[in-house]
Curated annotation (Swiss-Prot):
Its main location: membrane. It is found in: Cell membrane. Disulfide bonds join C176-C190, C228-C285. Residues 73-320 are extracellular. The gene is nkb-1. This is Sodium/potassium-transporting ATPase subunit beta-1. The sodium/potassium-transporting ATPase is composed of a catalytic alpha subunit, an auxiliary non-catalytic beta subunit and an additional regulatory subunit. Belongs to the X(+)/potassium ATPases subunit beta family. One of its GO terms (biological process) is intracellular sodium ion homeostasis. Disruption phenotype: Defecation defects. One of its GO terms (molecular function) is ATPase activator activity. Residues 1-51 are cytoplasmic. Glycans are attached at N140.
């Protein structure tokens, strides 16, 4: 007679069985969570749970202590004032970038300076940005010192207690100061030109016979000359007269840059005296020193922005 096989049966060592092989294997999930018979919770006794919890507490405490020790050792090797790696061959590099103001945070992707001469509201944001940017030069007076012709920030590297040179904003009084609305009201807008801060960087002077033609009549040893022109032939025809303040560009006495409280970044301004009305002019401004490279593709040593001064009647908004 053929033996009927139970579909739910399993074979253990060739012997058919329909029950668990061990008495302590739970039959239901509820028994797995709490087995009253064996006194276990999720398969472990109270003693077993206590041992494994203590083990992992000690293990992770040791791991955290080891990580904190490594972090402390690493932080001790860092200088809070100077990057660990800077200069040639690093991301920071040795070629300072060129920046400009006013740059509106509300339009971070735009390099256009556009306003209407007849509408004060159209250039209010530019005036506010210029004022905000220049405020830092007044607020650090007690942490800076006046530097004469023979003084410079070289003292900061020699003496850590020395104060940085105070930048004098009076060089912009003739047409590019807050009193004259930075020239925007009169249609002669001023733009701030600055260099990025590079630790330890200072301008290298050109030899007398190697000064670029663009700045030959304004170049002064020890300074960074600035030259702005139209980006294209058409722009060069329209840009008109450009005035530089100071005429020699950015004064070299404020270099090298050292990370210290009260440091004031030197700047220059360019004023567009005869820029045409209702025409867009693309401007290219370059900084000149022997150790500043120029590359159009990567925009090294230069900055681009657009200027458009409109002279149109202000359209009054009609109330609905």
């Amino acid at each position: 007679m053929e033996k009927k096989v139970d579909e739910n049966a399993t074979l253990m060592n060739g012997v058919e069985t329909t029950g668990p092989a061990r008495d302590d294997v739970p039959e239901t999930f509820r028994e797995f969570l709490y087995n009253k018979k064996n006194g276990t919770v999720m398969g472990r006794t109270g003693k077993s749970w206590f041992q494994i919890i203590v083990f992992y507490i000690i293990f992770y405490a040791f791991l955290a202590a080891f990580w904190l020790t490594c972090l402390t050792i690493f932080m001790k090797t860092l200088d809070p004032k100077v990057p660990r790696f800077y200069g040639k061959g690093t991301i920071i590099g040795v070629n300072p970038g060129v920046g400009y103001q006013p740059w509106l945070k509300e339009r971070p992707d735009s390099t256009l300076i556009k306003y209407n001469l007849r509408d004060q509201k159209s250039y209010k944001a530019y005036l506010e940005q210029m004022k905000t940017y220049l405020t830092k030069y007044d607020s650090n007076a007690t942490e800076t010192r006046e530097c004469g012709a023979g003084d410079s920030n070289d003292d900061l590297e020699k003496n850590p207690d020395a104060l940085p040179c105070r930048f004098d904003l009076s060089v912009f009084d003739k047409g590019c100061s807050e009193k004259s609305d930075f020239g925007y009201k009169s249609g002669k807008p001023c733009v701030i030109i600055s260099l990025n801060r590079l630790i330890g960087w200072r301008p290298t002077d050109y030899q007398e016979n190697s000064v670029p033609e663009e700045v030959k009549d304004r170049y002064k040893a020890g300074s960074i000359a600035i030259n702005c022109r139209g980006a294209t032939n058409v722009d060069q025809e329209h840009i008109g007269k450009v005035t530089y303040m100071p005429s020699n560009g950015i004064d070299g006495r404020y270099y090298p840059y050292v990370f210290t409280k009260g440091y004031q970044q030197p700047i220059a301004m360019v004023k567009f005296d005869t820029i045409p009305r209702n025409k867009l002019v693309i401007v290219e401004c370059r900084a000149y020193a022997l150790n500043i490279e120029h590359d159009i593709s990567s925009r090294l040593g230069m900055v681009y922005f657009e200027v458009m001064v409109e002279d149109k009647p202000v359209e009054e908004k009609k109330e609905l």
